[in-house]
Amino acid sequence: MNENNDDINNLNTPCVLVLDSVVRNNCIKMNERAASLGVNVRPHMKTHKTIEIGKYQFEENKNLNKSRGIIVSTLSEGKFFSKEFKDILYATPIAPNKVKDAYQLHLSIDRLNVMFDNIEHLKSMVDYAIKNPNEFQKKWSVFLKIDCGYHRAGADPKLQSTTDLVELIVNGEYNQYFQFQGIYSHSGHSYKCQTPTDIKNLAIEEARVTGDYGKKLKSLGYKVDTVSIGSTPVCSHLPHNLLSEYGVNEIHPGNYTFYDQMQYELGNCKLEDIGVHVLATIVSIYPERNELLVDAGSLALSSDPGCTHLRDLKVINNFGIVYNDTNLRIVAPSQEVSKIQSTNQSPIDFSKYKIGSKIRIIPNHSCLTAAMFSDYHVINNDNQIINSFKPNKHW
Amino acid sequence: MNENNDDINNLNTPCVLVLDSVVRNNCIKMNERAASLGVNVRPHMKTHKTIEIGKYQFEENKNLNKSRGIIVSTLSEGKFFSKEFKDILYATPIAPNKVKDAYQLHLSIDRLNVMFDNIEHLKSMVDYAIKNPNEFQKKWSVFLKIDCGYHRAGADPKLQSTTDLVELIVNGEYNQYFQFQGIYSHSGHSYKCQTPTDIKNLAIEEARVTGDYGKKLKSLGYKVDTVSIGSTPVCSHLPHNLLSEYGVNEIHPGNYTFYDQMQYELGNCKLEDIGVHVLATIVSIYPERNELLVDAGSLALSSDPGCTHLRDLKVINNFGIVYNDTNLRIVAPSQEVSKIQSTNQSPIDFSKYKIGSKIRIIPNHSCLTAAMFSDYHVINNDNQIINSFKPNKHW
C-alpha cells in the first residue's frame, strides 16, 4: 500500500520481507561450495518463484552450470521462468494431462527436461508424438527420477525394470522419441535427520546410491550427462569427493536461497542467513496471559509445524519465531491471526510490544510462507525497501 | 484452462471444486436451525471469500438477519464484500495501522463494525477522529470482543476494566465517537473437543459466559443490540433455549458453508455435506510400496494436520481423504505433490488408480485449502462445471 515509501513500518501487514544481501550471499556461498567440489548447481526455483532471485542463483559466475539450467516444481513455473531461462527441468513425474503443455514449452526454449519413473510416463509422451507427427520436431529431453531412500517418488535403482526403461529410450523402440539426459534423486528425508552428522551421512548415502547407479548405467554403455542429487540439508553437508569418488556432477538445492527456522534447527544455516521474514502488526495484547496477538495467521505463515522431532516437548508448537527476540514464538496460528508466547514463560516486555508495534517473524518453512504472498518487499541492510519482486502463483 | 468445457476431467490440476447444491443446502440448514431458535445468522465470509456464496448464506429468506450483516476476517475482505453487503463486522481487534482504511470503508457503506478488547483500540480510533475533524461524519460502530474461554482474543468479562471500556464509550468522554453495537465471542476451542457431547457442553458454556455478560451490561443500563456467539462446531450444537434463557440473539459461523474433514471427525457434518474438494491427478504409482503420488501438495491442500487429537495413533498423518474411497488418505504432503496410502494397509486397486487418473480429495481444513486457489470451479450434482467463483485474495 505504501510502496512509494521506503520505510517498512508503513507497509500494510501482513507482508513478506526479502533480505536482499542475505539472499544473494546464500546463493554465492552455495555456488562457491559446489564449485570447490567441481559440480554444477542446477538451482530450484520453487522456494522463491521469482525471476530476480533466479538470476541471483547464477550471479558472479560462481555457478559452473553454463547452460543456466534450472528446476521448477510446476509447469506454470516452467512457463514463467522460460522468459529468462532456456534449460528447465520440471521435477515431478510427468502426468498425461500435462504432456501437451510440456511439449509446447519444450519447443519454445532450448529444452524442457521432464521426469519419468514409470513406463506409463514414456508411453504418454510417445503417444503424443505419434498423434502429432507434424508438431513433433525434437525429441523429448528426459531425466530418470530414482528413489535414493526418501520413498516419495522415483524408480528403485536396484530393479532391472528401472534399467530396462533406460534401455527402451536409448536403444529400444522408443529411441526416436527421447534424449536421455541423466538421473536425478531428491533426499527429502534429510528434513527428518536429528543432527548435522546424520545429514552428512545421508549426503554420503544419496551420493552413493545415485552415483553408483550412474556408474552402472555408464558401465552398460549409456551416456549419462548428468548425475544430480539434492535437498538443501544434503547440499549443506556434501562429501568432498562427491565428483571424484561418487561421480555426482550436479546438485539441485532450492530452499537455501531463503532458508528458514527448519534449516536453522537442522543446523544448515545461522539465524542471520534466513532471507525471508513476515512483517506483522500486534493487534492486541493480553498481559494477564503473557500473550500477544498478531495479524499474521496460517494464511500468511502457512500451518507447517516445522521440525517438531527436534524440539523439546514443551516447545513443539512453534510456527515461527520473532526476529531479534527468538524467545518469542508463534504458538497457535488461526486463519488470519496468531498467538505469541515466550518459550521460557519469561514475562513479555509490554513496554516494547504494544498494540500497533511491528514484529518480524522468521517462518518455519519459507517455501510455503513465501507462496502465500503476491509481492515480496525487498529490503537492504538498512531495512529500506529497495525493490518489489512478484512471484509466479498457482498452477 | 478448459473453462469452456464442462467436464471436470479436462481441468488443469490441482484445482478446487465447489459442490453448488451441497453448499446451498449447508447454508439453508444453518439458517433454518437459527430461525427455529429465533436468532440471527451473521455469516462469516472467511471460509469461501466469494460474493456468490455470501449471497447463498442469505438465500430463501431463512436468515432472520434483515440487515444482511456479515463478518470478514481482513479489511481486504471488507472492501471486497462492500460491493454487495453494507453491514460488515471486521472480526479482528483493530490495529492502529488499519484505522484509516477502516474508517474509509465505514463511510462508504451503512456501517463497518470494528472490534475492541483494549483501551488502545479506542484511543487510536478517537485519535483518528480528532486529527480528521472534517472527515469524521459518523460515529465508529463497535463491538466489544470478549473471551469466552478460548483465550485467543477478547477482554475478560469478569474484570471491571472490561465494563469500564463500555462505560467510556457509552457515557464517558468517548461517547461522541462511538456507537456501541454489542458483544461478540468466538469459541475456537470447540475444535479441540473430543465428542459431540463436549461440543454441546461448550455451546452452553459460551452461551452462558457471553449471554450472562450481555445481561449484566443491560442490567447496568447499556443498550446491547447484539449478543453474538459462534464457531461452526458450537453452531452445530446450539441449546434450544439460546435466546430465551441466555439472551444470545446472533450466531456467526463460517466454515459450515464448506465443512471439511475436521468438521466430519468432530461430528458436525456428514461426508456428503462437505462442499469443497481438491481435484488432483495421479502423477505416479508405486505398487511395491502400495502408494500413489498426486499433484496436489501443501500449496493446494495446506499443511494443516487437522484434528490429530481425535485420531488413532496409526493414522495421525491424515492431510485429506479421497472422496468415494475414504480408506485412501494423504499421508505426506510436500510443496507440490503428496503421497497417498491406504489407512488399513489394504492393497490399493492399481487397476483403478493409474497414472493420469483423477481423484478428488476432501481437505482437512477447507478455510485454508480454499484460500490456496484463485478460482473455484463450481459443479452441479452431475459433476458438470456450471460456474466459476473468484475469491478475494490476500490483504
UniProtKB/Swiss-Prot annotation, chains A, B:
Cofactors (names): pyridoxal 5'-phosphate; Zn(2+)
EC top class named in words: lyase
Molecular function as annotated in GO: D-serine ammonia-lyase activity; metal ion binding
Annotated Zn(2+) binding sites: H365, C367
One Pfam match: D-ser_dehydrat
Record-stated family: Belongs to the DSD1 family.
Function: Catalyzes the conversion of D-serine to pyruvate and ammonia. Plays a role in D-serine detoxification.
Name of this chain's protein: D-serine dehydratase
Organism: Dictyostelium discoideum
Species classification: Eukaryota, Amoebozoa, Evosea, Eumycetozoa, Dictyostelia
